[in-house]
Amino acid sequence: IGVRLVGSEMCIRDRSIHYRLVPTAFNTFVGIGPYEKGLFHILDIKGTAVDTIGEQPYRDEAERNVPELARAMAYQGKIIISPKGNSLVHAIFMSPIISFYKLSLANIELLKSHVDCYPTYKPELGNNSYASAMSRSNILGFIDVAVTDRYVYALLSGKSTRESGLSAFTGNVIRVYDWNGDLLKIYTCNTDLTALCVSADDSIMYAIGLVEDYELLVANLK
């Protein structure tokens, strides 16, 4: 199966594979994964699927006709919940696309999306397998995301593996958004980073960066 599973879980009750599940403030879980239909699955506290929301991204109507399962492979990424559990950010790894949502008990409302570009890929769906062959010329998207009550910090690659090789899986640009999806500022680092987190008061950023070797780095934001 052509799936890149990061922090994935199998939900036995709804028999779906999820790339990631996050708890909400409403005693539910929101999941993303290689679904045949829908962008998000909502699960109750027992792990039973109760609803499907949205659809996988698409560039145009031609891509919209590609089965959602193949598009789910091409638009893999991660979801992060706000500390209060009522907002969600969906950051695509395979392409620089990031979207912001407001959560309620029964709905996931899109507030804003930022799309730098869309990926090029070839769907490969068989009877017992599914994958999307990605072009090496694609610009990669968001490597990691850290959140606080006020802000979303998104680490951007912005590079292709064709031009940058393995360094495309690192980034030195951090875009800072509020939970409405408005871009507030951009940090440019002098070191390639692979992961980051931010203190709850938005005063300190911690990151894993490549200096002579991978090191834990600290930056004051205030």
Where are each of the predicted segments found?
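Structural signature of eukaryotic scaffold interfaces centered on beta-propeller domains
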Residues: 19-25, 69-84, 137-148, 197-200
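Single conserved hydrophobic/aromatic residue that forms the stacking wall/gate
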Residues: 1-7, 11-12
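Conserved blade-ending motifs and adjacent loop-strand segments that build the rim/top face
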Residues: 115-128, 179-200
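Blade-level signature of beta-propeller repeat domains, shared across WD40, Kelch, NHL, RCC1
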Residues: 203-222
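Flexible internal linker/loop segments at domain or repeat junctions
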Residues: 107-145
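Beta-propeller blade signature
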Residues: 4, 40-46, 167-181, 220
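Loop/turn-rich, solvent-exposed surfaces of beta-rich toroidal or solenoidal domains
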Residues: 135-176
